[in-house]
C-alpha cells in the first residue's frame, strides 16, 4: 500500500492518487465536545509540506465517498484504503468513547451513505494514545445501534504512538479487538528513525501468535529509505511522494517481490509468502 500522507483537502485526493497512491492518510481534529470537526494537521508538520490545508470533516467525507464509489465521475478504482489519523490529544481520556460514537455517525451518514451504495474503501482508525482504546468500542456501538454492524468488516485499527509492542497488544485486549490490526511505526520526515521497532512489528505479524496483520512505516520520502523499509518487510509505506515509492517498486529487485494492492487484497489478512 502506497499511503499518501496528510491528504486533508478534497483536491489532494486526486493529486496523491494520480502520483501513485492507492491509500491516503487524513488528519481528523475534534472539537471540545468530541465531535470530529476538521481534516486538519496544523503547524508544525512534515518538512516541505503546507501544514494548513483543511476541510470540514463531513465535507471531506462526501468528497472521499465520490472518489471511492464506482460509477461516480470522481471515482478512483485504485484508492482502496483510508487511514484516519485521529488527533485525540485535544480530548480528555473519558471522551474517547464519545469520539468513537460521533466519528461512526459521521462516517455512516457522509461516507457510507447510511449503508446505501456508499464509499467502498477500507478504513483504518489510527489512535495516537493507548489510553483512548474505548474509542473503538464507541465506534462499534454506534454502528450497531444505527443498524449497520456489517460496516465493521470495512474497519481496522492502529495505535500510532510508537509504544512498546506488548503494551499495544494489551490495549487491543482491553478494547476487545482480535483482528483488522495495522501497526504503524515512524517519525516525521524531518528526522531519522531506525527500523528496529518495524522489525519487531514484522516479527509479531509473522509469528503464529502475533496480533498484527499489517505493518506500515512513515514518513518515507527518499528512494533509499523506501528500499530499507521494503527490505524490512513492511506492507505499507506512508509518503509525501507516492511517485518515489512507485518508482522503487518498479526496480528489478522489488518488482518480483511486491505489487501494489488492489481492492481484492484484503487489508485485514496477514500476507503469507
Curated annotation (Swiss-Prot):
Co-factor requirement: Mg(2+)
Enzyme class: lyase
Cofactor: binding details: Binds 1 Mg(2+) ion per subunit.
Tissue distribution: Expressed by the venom gland.
Subcellular location: Secreted
Protein origin, superkingdom: Eukaryota
Alphabetically ordered keywords of this record: Cytolysis, Dermonecrotic toxin, Disulfide bond, Glycoprotein, Hemolysis, Lipid degradation, Lipid metabolism, Lyase, Magnesium, Metal-binding, Secreted, Toxin
A Pfam family this chain is assigned to: GDPD_2
Glycosylated residues in this chain: 250
GO CC annotation terms, alphabetical: extracellular region
Known catalytic reactions: an N-(acyl)-sphingosylphosphocholine = an N-(acyl)-sphingosyl-1,3-cyclic phosphate + choline; an N-(acyl)-sphingosylphosphoethanolamine = an N-(acyl)-sphingosyl-1,3-cyclic phosphate + ethanolamine; a 1-acyl-sn-glycero-3-phosphocholine = a 1-acyl-sn-glycero-2,3-cyclic phosphate + choline; a 1-acyl-sn-glycero-3-phosphoethanolamine = a 1-acyl-sn-glycero-2,3-cyclic phosphate + ethanolamine
Record-linked SUPFAM superfamilies: PLC-like phosphodiesterases (SSF51695)
Catalytic residue list: 5, 41
One GO molecular-function entry: lyase activity
GO biological process: killing of cells of another organism; lipid catabolic process
Ligand binding (Mg(2+)): 25, 27, 85
Principal cellular location given in the protein's record: secreted
Entry EC no(s): 4.6.1.-
Disulfide bonds: 45-51, 47-190
Annotated family: Belongs to the arthropod phospholipase D family. Class II subfamily.
Job description of the protein: Dermonecrotic toxins cleave the phosphodiester linkage between the phosphate and headgroup of certain phospholipids (sphingolipid and lysolipid substrates), forming an alcohol (often choline) and a cyclic phosphate. This toxin acts on sphingomyelin (SM). It may also act on ceramide phosphoethanolamine (CPE), lysophosphatidylcholine (LPC) and lysophosphatidylethanolamine (LPE), but not on lysophosphatidylserine (LPS), and lysophosphatidylglycerol (LPG). It acts by transphosphatidylation, releasing exclusively cyclic phosphate products as second products.
Protein known as: Dermonecrotic toxin LarSicTox-alphaIB1aii
Organism (species): Loxosceles arizonica
